[in-house]
Amino acid sequence: MADITDIKTIIYTEKTLGLQEQGVVVIQTSPKVTKNGLKEVLKEYFGVTPLRINSLRITGKVKRFRGKVGQRDEIKKFYVKLPEGVSLENTEA
């Protein structure tokens, strides 16, 4: 099961601010979080039942530093459609 500590941040960019007008919030989490796990966390900690959840997995880029090969962390983003008039900003966690 997912935990509140698995949610890293809510993403605020030009694209996501436009989506927020439509009631969609973009949340960045660790890769192990599932849709059902995120739904449970939103219900438990924020008291919000999402209407729809879409997920997007982003693999870490391979980078070189001083001749050594490394890889950035993988992340997972969720596009969460909230009921009309509800936002995560006006709820207490």
From Swiss-Prot:
Part of the 50S ribosomal subunit. Contacts protein L29, and trigger factor when it is bound to the ribosome. The lineage of its organism: Bacteria, Pseudomonadati, Campylobacterota, Epsilonproteobacteria, Campylobacterales. InterPro entries: Nucleotide-bd_a/b_plait_sf, Ribosomal_uL23-like, Ribosomal_uL23/eL15/eS24_sf. This is Large ribosomal subunit protein uL23. One of the early assembly proteins it binds 23S rRNA. One of the proteins that surrounds the polypeptide exit tunnel on the outside of the ribosome. Forms the main docking site for trigger factor binding to the ribosome. It comes from Campylobacter curvus (strain 525.92). Belongs to the universal ribosomal protein uL23 family. One of its GO terms (biological process) is translation. The keyword Ribonucleoprotein applies. One of its GO terms (cellular component) is ribonucleoprotein complex. Transmembrane segments: none annotated. GO terms for molecular function: rRNA binding; structural constituent of ribosome. Keywords: Ribonucleoprotein, Ribosomal protein, RNA-binding, rRNA-binding.
